[in-house]
């Protein structure tokens, strides 16, 4: 395998680019700003792998590309960012399989029942189907479509879905499009679709023609292989896709790496992913960091002030398997020390998990959030002010964004019930990657070394709420 070439994009690009360069990987298709920052032109050849901020979630990195090269990039980033959670798509995106379908176009891939998008199905029909949507998170559904594609550096050939030419959204010049359409004409006449990737606009025509022929030959071999293949046989590997849920701990590591390239304020990446107002504050903070120190305490003060202005915060509780839950919208009532005081009221009956105590309408639920700490304190009271229990959720560093509080749950928790402190759900530690497990154990030990501090903060929060009545 040649040295992987990687394209990096998004708010983490500078830090990620430095990590990859320092580990001996090559960069490709660099933005002008990134070239200036790192003093590196990058390879003129197109990338094998793209690492970018997710379009859907600024706390996530998306790593996608040719499987072998992508695995190398994932391995490299894991070393530098050990506390983040990787969600590898299964099976590979755009991988292709020989499958047998029934009359309703259903099939089984492994143990999972899948519906295949196809023009015509009958019981026992064998066909080649592409994975057009992989399973990344627990609620994701696998989607397949009849036909397949083969992917090159400059183009993709799509087989079994008609003919024609399509373009990357980054190819906009009409003259370039006309040239690429003419180059694809011969292959399209053979009944296939050509999709030109963004890298095609910079390549020499002869290079593009050679790749089209190479891809067509590969597609022909796949069809020959599929003739005698059994149901479930993979005939094309597709692209590796890894969605990385970045923890605060790794964002801080990326801050340190970025600071070796350009001035970087504390918690740069956490604030940058927190919302537009926070991102604007980062621009100013980085400029100040170029000439003087920006203290972490000042960042915490800024976040608390901003959260108070927000009035309400949604608590987003993420799990290591990728599941995500909203604990509800809480009213910001102020702060005691460095803790935001959030208030909710129960509207129905239920049970407080972990405490094994009945939840009733009118119960007061206080949540105490200390930005960047590794725990949340939840205190529960009945409508008469009697304590039902205290629940301390141990998690990755808490990030307070514009309208939300977010973290990854580390499974183990601490409770105070009937005058006693205890640790619960310790068996959940086995589900954590080793670095996160070590964080969780250390945090539990730290919290249990001064439980009176938890009670003190809760008491101060109650005083604040009482004073506002």
From Swiss-Prot:
GO MF, one example: RNA endonuclease activity, producing 5'-phosphomonoesters
Enzyme class: hydrolase
Keyword Hydrolase: yes
Short name of one Pfam family: DUF402
Nuclease as UniProt keyword: yes
Coiled coil: none
Top-level taxon in the UniProt lineage: Archaea
GO BP field: rRNA processing
Function summary: Probable RNase involved in rRNA stability through maturation and/or degradation of precursor rRNAs. Binds to RNA in loop regions with AU-rich sequences.
Assigned protein family: Belongs to the FAU-1 family.
Protein name per Swiss-Prot or TrEMBL: Probable ribonuclease FAU-1
Organism: Ignicoccus hospitalis (strain KIN4/I / DSM 18386 / JCM 14125)
């Amino acid at each position: 395998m040649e040295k992987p070439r990687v394209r990096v994009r998004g708010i983490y690009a500078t830090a990620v680019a430095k990590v990859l360069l320092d580990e001996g990987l090559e960069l490709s298709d660099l933005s002008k700003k990134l070239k200036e920052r790192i003093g590196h032109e990058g390879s003129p050849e197109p990338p094998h792998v793209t690492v970018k901020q997710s379009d859907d979630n600024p706390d996530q990195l998306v790593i996608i590309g040719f499987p072998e090269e992508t695995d190398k990039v994932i391995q490299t980033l894991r070393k530098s960012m050990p506390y983040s959670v990787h969600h590898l798509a299964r099976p590979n995106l755009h991988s292709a399989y020989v499958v047998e379908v029934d009359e309703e176009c259903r099939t089984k891939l492994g143990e999972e029942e899948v519906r295949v998008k196809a023009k015509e199905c009958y019981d026992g029909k064998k066909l080649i189907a592409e994975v057009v949507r992989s399973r990344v998170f627990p609620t994701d559904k696998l989607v397949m479509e009849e036909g397949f594609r083969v992917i090159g550096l400059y183009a993709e050939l799509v087989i079994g879905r008609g003919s024609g030419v399509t373009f990357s959204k980054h190819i906009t010049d009409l003259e370039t499009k006309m040239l690429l359409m003419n180059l694809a004409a011969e292959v399209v006449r053979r009944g296939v679709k050509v999709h030109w990737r963004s890298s095609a606009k910079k390549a020499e025509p002869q290079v593009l023609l050679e790749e089209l022929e190479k891809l067509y030959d590969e597609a022909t071999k796949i069809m020959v292989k599929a003739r005698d293949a059994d149901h479930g046989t993979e005939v094309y590997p597709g692209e590796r896709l890894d969605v990385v849920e970045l923890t605060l701990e790794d964002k801080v590591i990326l801050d340190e790496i970025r600071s070796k390239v350009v001035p970087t304020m504390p918690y740069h990446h956490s604030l940058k992913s927190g919302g537009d107002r926070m991102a604007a504050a980062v621009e100013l903070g980085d400029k100040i960091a170029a000439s003087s120190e920006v203290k972490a305490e000042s960042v915490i003060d800024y976040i608390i002030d901003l959260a108070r202005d927000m009035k309400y915060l949604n608590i987003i509780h993420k799990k290591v398997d990728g599941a995500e839950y909203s604990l509800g919208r809480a009213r910001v009532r102020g702060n005691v020390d460095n803790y935001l005081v959030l208030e909710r009221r129960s509207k129905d009956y239920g049970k407080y998990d972990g405490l094994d105590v009945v939840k009733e309408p009118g119960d007061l639920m206080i949540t105490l959030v200390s930005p960047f700490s590794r725990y949340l304190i939840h205190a529960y009271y009945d409508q008469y002010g009697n304590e039902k229990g205290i629940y301390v959720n141990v998690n990755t560093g808490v990030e307070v964004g514009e309208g939300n509080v977010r973290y990854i749950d580390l499974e183990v928790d601490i409770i105070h019930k009937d005058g006693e402190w205890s640790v619960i759900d310790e068996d959940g530690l086995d589900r954590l990657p080793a670095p996160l497990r070590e964080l969780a154990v250390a945090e539990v030990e730290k919290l249990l070394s001064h439980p009176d501090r938890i009670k003190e903060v809760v008491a101060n929060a109650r005083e604040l709420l009482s004073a506002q009545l």
